[in-house]
Amino acid sequence: LVLVNYLLFKGKWKVPFNPNDTFESEFYLDEKRSVKVPMMKIKEVTTPYVRDEELSCSVLELKYTGNASALFILPDQGKMQQVESSLQPETLKKWKDSLIPSIINDLRMPKFSISTDYSLEKEVLPELGIKKVFSQQADLSRITGTKDLYVSQVVHKAVLDVAETGTEATAATGVATVIRRQPRTLNFNQPFMVFITDMDSQSILFVAKITNPS
């Protein structure tokens, strides 16, 4: 018996990108290599932002219609490992609490789609104490009608698509004042991370590290 978990989240940006403005641009994998990707862009967008000088990264929040938001973390060139090693619940809370509505004069972000499959029966679930269901001693008769079945595999599939109108992922209404007005450009043309969260519960729905969006 194989159990499959497929979680679906569909979000539309509160402020969408215009597909007509998407263009081909370089995404730098490292200091020597780059790939061509479709790059979305939007000008003069007001959105929560903070610069973390201690960790050498920029943090941007884009909100969806409804109660979800995406937190994009853009480390400076060569600083990804430093940011990753510092990622703790306290770090995310600090960023969230420090976000200030800001005008981004030029925001550029690649379209990307990533997909990952996880097998949970070997390590994750047994570490949680779920073991018997994977052995011949399992009794699934109350849900299957037979005692001869046991679970051989548990698969979790996660898919994340980010495009102009919003996000498809498987696995306050506005800003009254703008505090930061100095010109600011954000170009996600190098590896970055994204956290999709539920704003009501502050639960993290999806986490992804984008190293090659092509």
From Swiss-Prot:
Keywords per UniProt: Protease inhibitor, Serine protease inhibitor
GO terms under biological process: response to cytokine
InterPro entries per the UniProt record, alphabetical: Serpin_CS, Serpin_dom, Serpin_fam, Serpin_sf, Serpin_sf_1, Serpin_sf_2
SMART domains, per database record: SERPIN
Annotated site, Reactive bond, chain positions: R180, R181
One GO MF term attached to the UniProt entry: serine-type endopeptidase inhibitor activity
GO cellular component: extracellular space
Top-rank lineage group of the source organism: Eukaryota
Family: Belongs to the serpin family.
Protein name as it appears in the record: Serine protease inhibitor 2.1
The species this protein was found in: Rattus norvegicus (Rat)
